[in-house]
């Protein structure tokens, strides 16, 4: 996921401040996810995992989801498409998929926020981390479609400079 993010950032980075901020927030989320998945339980019975790392990940997760749903998606769609765009049908497919994905991710958040992970629940938690990684990957692929559409739209809207003339 980090490699794909780096590639996307190289392709579209700098084209729009909103996209740059969004990609930066995604990177922060991925770093916090990587921190959580790297945590292993101690051998002692009932030794909790690093709750601070889990708390940080859950905080970044909610911030990322909220900014997408309440700020970024609508702005991108309005800037890129308008109500009569031929791509509107595509976003009517992507947005519901993102909404369903959000429900899956929030179920993880609700389940594992404010819970102590001990040896008895460690296996279940590790599976949940794997599942949330897959959900994030699916989400990022959907969001990448929106970002790509936005980048293409903004690129097409820029004037073409050829031999000192603006066309």
From Swiss-Prot:
Keyword annotations of the record: Cytoplasm, Transcription, Transcription regulation
A GO cellular-component term linked to this record: cytoplasm
Gene3D superfamilies listed in its UniProt record: Regulator of RNA polymerase sigma(70) subunit, domain 4 (1.20.120.1370)
GO BP, one annotated term: regulation of DNA-templated transcription
Subcellular location: Cytoplasm
Pfam families, alphabetized: Rsd_AlgQ
Reported function: Binds RpoD and negatively regulates RpoD-mediated transcription activation by preventing the interaction between the primary sigma factor RpoD with the catalytic core of the RNA polymerase and with promoter DNA. May be involved in replacement of the RNA polymerase sigma subunit from RpoD to RpoS during the transition from exponential growth to the stationary phase.
Family: Belongs to the Rsd/AlgQ family.
Subunit-level organization: Interacts with RpoD.
The protein's name: Regulator of sigma D
Species of origin: Yersinia enterocolitica serotype O:8 / biotype 1B (strain NCTC 13174 / 8081)
């Amino acid at each position: 996921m980090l490699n794909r993010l780096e590639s996307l950032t190289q392709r579209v980075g700098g084209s729009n401040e909103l996209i740059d901020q969004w990609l930066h927030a995604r990177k922060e989320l991925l770093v916090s996810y990587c921190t959580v998945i790297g945590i292993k339980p101690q051998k002692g019975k009932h030794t909790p995992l690093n709750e601070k790392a889990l708390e940080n990940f859950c905080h970044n997760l909610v911030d990322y989801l909220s900014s997408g749903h309440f700020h970024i998606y609508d702005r991108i769609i309005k800037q890129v498409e308008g109500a009569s765009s031929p791509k509107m049908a595509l976003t009517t497919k992507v947005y519901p998929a993102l909404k369903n994905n959000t429900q899956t991710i929030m179920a993880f958040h609700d389940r594992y926020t404010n819970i102590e992970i001990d040896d008895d629940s460690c296996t279940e938690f590790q599976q949940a981390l794997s599942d949330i990684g897959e959900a994030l990957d699916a989400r990022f692929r959907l969001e990448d479609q929106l970002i790509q559409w936005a980048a293409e739209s903004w690129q097409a809207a820029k004037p073409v400079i050829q031999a000192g003339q603006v066309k």
